[in-house]
UniProtKB/Swiss-Prot annotation:
The lineage of its organism: Eukaryota, Viridiplantae, Streptophyta, Embryophyta, Tracheophyta. This is F-box/LRR-repeat protein At2g43260. Residues 7-53 form the F-box domain. LRR repeats lie at residues 112-135, 226-251. NCBIfam families: F_box_assoc_1 (TIGR01640). Keywords: Leucine-rich repeat, Repeat. It holds the Pfam family F-box. The keyword Repeat applies. Signal peptide: none annotated. It comes from the Eukaryota. It comes from Arabidopsis thaliana. The keyword Nucleotide-binding does not apply.
Length: 420
């Protein structure tokens, strides 16, 4: 009687087998399964599981678009995705006029006083002070110069330790008639919530330049009399120069991460409309032209419009999905040399992959949803999300979730126990 008797009805599942089964569940089901047991929660919240899950999700990347709304409601994914042609579009409820940066399914929103980091897949949100002193003293008085328009921002993930980091370079003129600005550089570690100073870059890049994170480095494109590409290794936290492709760059050139490769999309208007796509081998830092698409009379007319085009995805058949600054989405089929319009009204943000990597919340972090902030959990005026219901509706919702978890658990047990 001193020893506990084993329950003959219990089923022991090997952790390795359980992990393989859970990896193949939809993300929503995975999140709900965390409350089944401590063992399941520990497994599902491990960095190993998150990395393996993201590797599997990379094979079914989708497109993230803004459900453009300035209602002031919380930023979150719409419940259901939609298809434009055969491309799956995931919509984020947000104000598309505000700047944003994405990396592997996590989004960063830089604001005047705060840096907001959001994982739409898990609904985790963190906010951090911008780390800047907005008041700069000049000889002729006190000027407010530190607005987001005076920053060069970057957001990415350290490929060595997996930490997300935010980079900002601010430019200030401390004296009247000062030719070169004073550059202040800093990096925010999302895990610790702390800012650290960086050594200045070898040269200044355009204020407001969009950043791209590829393979653990953030890149910026500088376009003036000469064009340059600046890179920051997020693990070493060191800047370095990157060679440019052997072609002419236009002021409307867009730099993106296309299938884990640094890409420049160049829109040419003379002698005809052409979209050129150049990709760089990250390790050799050598460029090659991967697409040259004629746009005349298919996408644009001969009228000289302010137009540029940005690639967003490549299908398994090497078909290129791209969009323009007029909210139109296209797909190019190289074999047929054909362009199809998938949507006439869409605000594309970036490629999207579901990501279960947690955003740590530590006592030193500010509360993610301060009162009277733009991120307070409240009802959206656009009526996208249901209002908080009565206690009866809450009980029904809880019962539905419990049943989903029960059926998932039974499916796993059946998958493991049924004879082959």
């Amino acid at each position: 009687m001193g020893e506990e008797e084993e329950n003959p009805n219990s089923i022991d599942i090997l952790p390795e087998l359980l992990e393989e089964v859970l990896l193949r569940l939809p993300t929503k089901s995975i999140l709900k399964c965390r409350i089944v047991s401590k063992q399941w929660r520990s497994l599902l919240e491990s960095s190993r599981f998150a990395e393996r899950h993201m590797s599997l999700q990379n094979s079914r990347r989708r497109i993230l678009a803004a459900y453009n709304c300035d209602c002031g409601g919380r930023r979150k994914l719409l419940p259901e995705s939609r298809f434009e042609g055969d491309e799956e579009i995931v919509y984020l409820h947000c104000d598309a006029s505000r700047p944003s940066m994405t990396c592997q399914g996590v989004i960063c929103f830089p604001e005047q006083d705060w840096i907001i980091v959001l994982n739409p897949s898990t609904s985790q949100l963190r906010r951090f002070p911008s780390g800047l002193n907005h008041n700069c003293r000049f000889r002729i008085g006190l000027w407010k110069t530190f607005s987001p328009g005076n920053w060069v921002m970057g957001f990415g993930r350290d490929k060595v330790n997996g930490r997300y980091k935010v980079v900002r370079m601010s430019f200030a003129f401390w004296r009247v008639r000062q030719e070169e600005p004073v550059v202040e550089c800093g990096v925010l570690d999302v895990d610790t919530g702390e800012w650290r100073k960086l050594s200045p870059p070898p040269y200044v890049v355009n204020v407001g330049s969009k950043s791209v994170c590829v393979n653990g480095s953030i890149y910026w494109l500088h376009i003036q009399t000469v064009y340059r590409i600046l890179a920051l290794d997020l693990h070493k936290e060191e800047f370095h120069k990157v060679p440019v492709p052997p072609t002419q760059i236009t002021v409307d050139t867009q730099m993106v991460n296309l299938e884990d490769r640094l890409v420049l999309a160049i829109t040419r208007v003379s002698p005809e409309w052409i979209l050129e796509v150049w990709g760089m081998d990250t390790y050799k830092e050598k460029w090659s032209k991967t697409y040259s698409i004629s746009l005349d009379h298919r996408v644009v007319s001969w009228r000289r419009q302010k137009r540029w085009f940005t690639p967003v995805a490549v299908s398994k058949q090497a078909n290129l999905v791209f969009y323009d600054n007029k909210k139109r989405l296209f797909k190019y089929y190289p074999v047929k040399d054909e362009i199809r319009c998938l949507s006439l009204d869409i605000c594309v943000l970036s490629p999207y992959v579901e990501n279960l990597v947690p955003l740590p919340l530590k006592p030193s972090h500010p509360h993610p949803t301060p009162k009277n902030s733009d991120f307070e959990m409240r009802i959206s005026r656009c009526r996208l999300f249901s209002t908080p219901g009565s206690w009866i509706s809450k009980i029904l919702k809880w019962n539905v979730m419990t049943l989903e978890i029960l059926f998932t658990s039974l499916a796993i047990v059946g998958y493991i126990c049924l004879p082959l």
